[in-house]
Amino acid sequence: MGQKVNPNGIRLGYIRDWRSTWYADSSSYATKLNEDIKVREFLHKKLAAAAVSKIQIERPAQNAKITIHTARPGIVIGKKGEDVEKLRAEVHKLMGIPVQINIEEVRKPEIDAKLVAESVAQQLEKRVMFRRAMKKAMQAAMKSGAKGIKIMVSGRLGGAEIARSEWARDGRVPLQTFRADVDYATAEALTTYGVIGVKVWIYKGEILPGQIAEKKNNKKGAK
């Protein structure tokens, strides 16, 4: 019987990059990994209103470079960059090393799996019918250029006594093609009936070997 694997994890090293990029020996690896987890939790909590998609952490020498991908960069930066400076000071306290924070804008939040999952979860918390929330998200994604989208919600849907899962799909979502650019994310809706889990898969097209090499070269050039 086939088993489903995390679409992001299986594509690491092919068309996906790691979200933490650093090297550590066995004595300090666990400490640094724990630091990364705490920093991500802190930033997601602190920037809950800023629609944060992902946080990338690099550690060149004895420094940390954090890139925050957000759909609302204005909220993160604040007036004249005040908020981002406060944020940098707080993260510096957490990590104990000099920190540089970069902000990258998510141009199309409608085809970002994390932002779509959180949007559906927020609607479920506001008692919007799950089918309506799913349909709205799928229509917006397809209009914004997605090749396919699948959304699954699980829990006590509509306050039902027995928990169940329901899903909907528009277009195609090829999970077994490694070069298929499939963005996957999850979110949780905390409703009065309990927790409802939301999973989102968004297919954006294929990334060919030449494009992967070009992407890596551009990244090296930017550094």
Swiss-Prot record:
Q: Name one Pfam family in it.
A: KH_2
Q: Which GO terms describe its cellular component?
A: cytosolic small ribosomal subunit
Domain KH type-2, residue spans: 39-107
The answer to whether UniProt assigns keyword Ribonucleoprotein to this entry is: yes
InterPro entries per the UniProt record, alphabetical: KH_dom, KH_dom-like_a/b, KH_dom_type_2, KH_sf_prok-type, Ribosomal_S3_C_sf, Ribosomal_uS3_bac-typ, Ribosomal_uS3_C, Ribosomal_uS3_CS
Q: Which GO terms describe its molecular function?
A: mRNA binding; rRNA binding; structural constituent of ribosome
**Gene3D superfamilies noted in UniProt:** 3.30.300.20, Ribosomal protein S3, C-terminal domain (3.30.1140.32)
Matches recorded under PROSITE patterns: KH_TYPE_2, RIBOSOMAL_S3
- Could you say which protein family the record assigns here? Belongs to the universal ribosomal protein uS3 family.
Per UniProt, subunit arrangement is: Part of the 30S ribosomal subunit. Forms a tight complex with proteins S10 and S14.
Sum up the protein's function in the record's words.
Binds the lower part of the 30S subunit head. Binds mRNA in the 70S ribosome, positioning it for translation.
Task: Write the protein's name.
Answer: Small ribosomal subunit protein uS3
